[in-house]
Every structure is written in C-alpha cells, then in structure tokens.
Amino acid sequence: MRVFVYGTLLAGESNHGWLKGALNLGRWTTPPLFRLIDLGPYPVLSPGGRTAVTGEVYRISRLILQRLDVLEGYPGDYQRRLIDTPWGRAWVY
C-alpha cells in the first residue's frame, strides 16, 4: 500500500520518523483539486479547492499505516482517503 505525505511527514521534517521502514517512491504534485488549510504547525488537505499540493509518495506496510493513523488522530481529527498517484492509489490524510 502507499501513502501521499505533505507537511511534517516530508523527508527532513519533524514527523518523518513515523515513516521509518517505508520506501520513498518519489516526489509528486497533485492536480489542483484541493484546499490546503494552514492550522499553524499542521497543514490540512481538503478536497474541493483549486490548489495543487506537492509531497512524497511512500510504499508502506499495514503497521506503518496504523502508526500514521495514531499520529493523525484517525478516525477523528483527520480523514483518510485514497487518491490516484503515478504509483497507484495512495492514502492521504
């Protein structure tokens, strides 16, 4: 499975360690279909806007996905949905 990350989960950012063991497939920019909401230290990606978001796509295990769910407060604070990427469908929070 795959995950698309942006913000604090990117390589070099404060929460990137949560992706330990994941394989970076590459950098990618979404189509301009989102809104990126600034909540201070944590950006939120929301559907229905006109913004393209640049991030990274990783191949992850089910265990890493479960860890990311804990970090993101899913279910609860964040939603998790599938988006299409050049490497196939990927989860995004």
Give residue ranges: language-model regions.
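Glycine-aromatic micro-motifs
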Residues: M1-Y93
